[in-house]
């Protein structure tokens, strides 16, 4: 799922390390892991994981790849939203495990 989703943002495929997978870019690291406490994994309540998109088109491709690989759309459809942070193009998904994700492009 995440290889297909993050590939639309030009992120290389993840590297598996024991019970984790890492996605590395020049600006950060995203990792998915089995819980180290042995308890079941659960989606964040009120949390959103965000990824930068280079353009609205890239955010749309990210959203489409997510849907094609088992995600569900949430929030409003992808599009422009204005608020205190300025004008943003946002696309929201829930991954197959229910985690809320967002691709964001800041419009100049």
Spans of features found by a protein language model:
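Active-site beta-strand termini and strand-to-loop segments that position acidic
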Residues: 23-27, 93-96, 106
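Core segments of cupin and vicinal oxygen chelate
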Residues: 1-30
